[in-house]
């Protein structure tokens, strides 16, 4: 039996069979033995109502998806009207020129968004040759730097960038008289004031660098590059989602939306500037820009369980990033763990003693869920191994393995379907603005992130939700396509599109 077949099996019926077998065995012993066995059996049935309630609350049927999609579109409009008017920040990227394929020359990118930073260079050859060559290098950031001071962090980054530039070979050519230009992917909350400047709001993702909040991160990097003697200009500051959109659109003009589904999640899309009320005071020329939705903060209408609420209450940011906590890879395994904790507390699903490792927050991770759902063996041997290695359950029963897989599927199904509803909300908002510009033609949603790439069930549930909400005619015009590691290349391409040496600025669409 495959894992899919296992989760299709009626778990309550399986519980009843196990109970009947145990009752049959208990009849052969004395009354004392029978009493002990029956008392151990009774709690096992307690998982059935927990599982039934979980199925119901995580089903995310079409009416729930419709409510979420409509609320997403409404939240987008509120965020575009006024800062602070809704949950969605709707941050203008100030990108008014996207790469077209005409760009030529040598450009660099720096991607900072976690415990490593990545530097890369790309040689562009215009429409005919496109990307001629690329090279990249990844550098691990020591913990003391992540918890140090601003100057030390940016000096460390500039030093790594300087060493990388020094290895520039003959296949990369900087035109005479030009300064090297850099696209800076900075995946932390910033108040972006122009294409090449942004004020850090706060550090996240384990960084606690003092003295940076409230400062322009591009100015910090420029100062560090000067201290290193590195003659380079930052021509574009972007977040990873914006970089992904730019990288995908370089190859396909129909890309209008980019979504990252990995450890965290975010989405951005192309927006007409005249439909952004909060920017009207800037008197921008009619055209397009990219809006960073910061959709992880969305929460309106989400079908939450007691396990979601408990996890949120105990998080470092209670009441915040609810959509992210419901659909992203950081949290899906933890939600499943909390369900299993409750089941273990009220039953002997994992044996007569509570598995101590199961009490550790985040011990069960989303890759574990993925591995268990790919188990196609009759006895779910991979599931048994994970339960043993990760939460310390030795020789988990087949029932325990099946229940674990079904709980995982419930949470993954809800996450994927809600992500799909979010995508539809963005597309429908864009359609309402453009009157036929989205669903009247081919439109591409560029996807990146390990959760989307590596978890087939999640990916399938997401696409099913999009198809259900849009219907066959409209959904057939929407292409959801994977673009791997697009943010780094995208930053270099945005540096090229916004180069001070560009002969002309070309609008996004």
UniProtKB/Swiss-Prot annotation:
GO terms for biological process: glucose 6-phosphate metabolic process; glucose metabolic process; glycolytic process; intracellular glucose homeostasis. CDD domains: ASKHA_NBD_HK_plant. ADP binds at residues 114-116, 263, 450. Disulfide bonds: none annotated. SUPFAM superfamilies: Actin-like ATPase domain. Residues 100-238 are annotated as: Hexokinase small subdomain. Induction: Not induced by glucose or fructose treatment in leaves. Its EC number is 2.7.1.1. Keywords: ATP-binding, Chloroplast, Glycolysis, Kinase, Nucleotide-binding, Plastid, Transferase, Transit peptide. GO terms for cellular component: chloroplast stroma; cytosol; mitochondrion. D-glucose binds at residues 204-205, 239-240, 266, 294, 324. Residues 45-496 form the Hexokinase domain. Expressed in roots, leaves, flowers, immature seeds, endosperm and seed coat. It is found in: Plastid, Chloroplast stroma. One of its GO terms (molecular function) is fructokinase activity. It catalyses: a D-hexose + ATP = a D-hexose 6-phosphate + ADP + H(+); D-fructose + ATP = D-fructose 6-phosphate + ADP + H(+); D-glucose + ATP = D-glucose 6-phosphate + ADP + H(+). It holds the Pfam family Hexokinase_1. Residues 239-485 are annotated as: Hexokinase large subdomain. Belongs to the hexokinase family. Fructose and glucose phosphorylating enzyme. This is Hexokinase-4, chloroplastic. The lineage of its organism: Eukaryota, Viridiplantae, Streptophyta, Embryophyta, Tracheophyta.
